[in-house]
Amino acid sequence: MPDTVPTAAELLKPQLPPIIRDLLTSLGAPVRIVHERPGSGPPRVQAALLEDAAGSLLVLFPGDQLLDLHRLKTVVGRDLVPAEARRRQLLDGARLSALPGLPALIDAPCLYDERLLQEPSLLLDSGQPHVLLEIDREVYRSLLADAHGARFGMPLVRLRHNLQRHAAEPMEAVQGFTARRIRQRLERRVEIPPRQNTVRRIHQLYGNLRGCSDDDVTDLIETDPALAAQVVSWAGLSGTAHHPAPERVLSVEDAIVRVLGSEVVLNLSLGLSEGKPPEPPDARDDMTSYWEAALYTATLMDGLCRAMPRGTRPEPGLAYLAGLLHNFGYLTLAHIFPPYFKLLSQHLQINPHIPHALVEHHLLGVTREQIGAWLMEHWQMPEELTVALNGQHDADYRGRHAVYANLVYLAVNLLRNRGIGDTPQEEIPPRLLDDLGLTRARAEEALDRVLAAETALRVLLAQPE
């Protein structure tokens, strides 16, 4: 029947998940369905589900604030942690992509930051990707009738100011007690074992030394961030008075073929593998794994280099390493500083709307990028890698070796646009593309080629026996 055929406008209208639509109807709460748009607009309500031995607590706070569990404890007197298992069960059962700030949806007491009700209207997650609910203040106040209000969120403006001040004055970053302890520990001997899958392949290659080639060893090492970094470091530090190392080690292949040799690399790798392999950082189901993100970024860095004009291309081996190691500080935290890593992981889970650098600097006085860069310096890695790690989130960086930092910024955000990675998405400025000699179309083509090789990349990560 013609009158039942939906119009084009109706087909394009965003739809709410049934459980949210029915809940709003039963509550008699009028809302406006809007598409998610970056930039200004009503404040967004963040919802965090927490728990302790006494039970669960739903916490609602503005999106321009950070939820600090220690500060929250001073308000509620409870040692709360993310209720990740229950959150995931709730989202999966209701087929929601995110937790809406609707207290009636969850069988748990609710605490909200009073500053939410200072705004004329608010935005709530709908549970449908990129679809939000705009709700007037008085309507939302009625939904919070049984909840308790308090002030506990930390304004991001203050956190950004502190981070920018320390970025402008690098020595400030090591003045805090925690940051100072981290740097002092990194200045002692640090060894990070390879992944378990890498260890299995190392044993296989070592058991067949005559049959394995330099390419076999290089291909394996280049899939493991920790092992790749340490192999390049060994090569750079391997010189003696009688046998100096090459002036520059520019890639994993350089380190293996020109300096160390496959047998030495496998022997040293076996020694490293006696330590406990690092667990994948932050193994939340809805996040791309650390290992995948590292390999995707490295592979895309290689593709972007090839797409650049010949005269402006950086060293491809160093560009690949910059991508592979771009998040190396996070892996270092996980392996060397487990208590700090646990604290950080909890706060990243409940503050997914905030760039990780703000969370890390607030909690530790230092960011993962600074930690990774410190370790690059201590291992005497090429300066380009230190710059790439430190400058990767600054789209305006144009200092020494800027091409590496700019390429990492580009690669990470191209991947994030396609749903790979777990950091808040940032705009890619046209000027950055211009300075790299790239167009957005050529950059996207490089990304398409990487994603087309997804099966091959997953095989590399799996390293099947």
State what each model feature region is.
Residues 21, 25, 69-70, 141, ...:
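Short glycine-/small-residue-rich flexible loop motifs, especially phosphate/cofactor-binding loops
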